[in-house]
Amino acid sequence: MGQKVHPKIIRLGIIKYWLSTWYANTKEFAENLQGDFKVRQFLTKELSKASISHVVIERPPKSIRVTIYTARPGIVIGKKGEDVEKLRKRVALIAGVPAQINTYEIRKPELDPKLVADGITSQLERRVMFRRAMKRAVQNTMRAGAKGIKVEVSGRLGGAEIARTEWYREGRVPLHTLRADIDYDTSEAHTTYGVIGVKVWIFKGEILGTVLPFKQAEQPKQQQRKGRSKENR
């Protein structure tokens, strides 16, 4: 059986960025990694209704900076910033260092695979037919400007006794083209028949040229030679 590589991991360092960006020695690495996991787990549970796509964590010296990518920043910030201040204190307590929380609004949630997958799972939990939920998500994503999308659901679909997998694709989804900007995410629907898994691939176009996940060093400026130019001679 053919297995598919994770579309984001294979593109790290080429056109994709890491969700955790920090350096640590051998003793601190495991502690920081576990701290990142706990922070993401807490935010996902606490902000389950805020349509969170992903969380980027940076660790400047003796502090932590968390950026929350969400389609509903108002729920994260709260009235006069009260909710985000509570989150900051809880994150600082979990990480053990002073915390800073930023929010980034996702303008087009139809092009975010995590939000699309969560939308499908919420419909499945409300007993919407899985084919209708899949086709509706595909149509909305293509209408928003995507070049291609693939949606896959697996489990006891429609309450069947034997689990199966069904998928629907529209447009192009080139998984092995490294310059292809493909986003991928998953979600789970907990129904009365069991768990139904949802996978979403979204192709947004090709990124041409060199795109690295770090700033390139500035080229040294060429010093102008003193003296008269040929025009002045």
Swiss-Prot record:
> Is this entry keyworded Transferase?
no
Q: Which GO terms describe its molecular function?
A: mRNA binding; rRNA binding; structural constituent of ribosome
A GO cellular component annotation in the UniProt record: cytosolic small ribosomal subunit
One of this protein's GO BP terms? translation
| CDD domains per record | KH-II_30S_S3
Q: Which UniProt keywords apply?
A: Ribonucleoprotein, Ribosomal protein, RNA-binding, rRNA-binding
**Database matches in Pfam families:** KH_2, Ribosomal_S3_C
The source's domain of life comes to Bacteria
Signal peptide extent:
none
The transmembrane residues are none
What PROSITE patterns does this protein's entry cite?
KH_TYPE_2 (PS50823), RIBOSOMAL_S3 (PS00548)
Please report the stretch or stretches of sequence annotated as the KH type-2 domain.
Answer: 39-107
User: SUPFAM superfamilies in the record, alphabetically?
Assistant: Prokaryotic type KH domain (KH-domain type II), Ribosomal protein S3 C-terminal domain
> Any idea what job this protein has?
Binds the lower part of the 30S subunit head. Binds mRNA in the 70S ribosome, positioning it for translation.
Assembly information from the UniProt record: Part of the 30S ribosomal subunit. Forms a tight complex with proteins S10 and S14.
Which PANTHER family does the annotation name? 30S/40S RIBOSOMAL PROTEIN S3 (PTHR11760), SMALL RIBOSOMAL SUBUNIT PROTEIN US3C (PTHR11760:SF19)
Regarding protein family, the annotation reads: Belongs to the universal ribosomal protein uS3 family.
Q: What is this protein called?
A: Small ribosomal subunit protein uS3
Gene name tied to this protein: rpsC
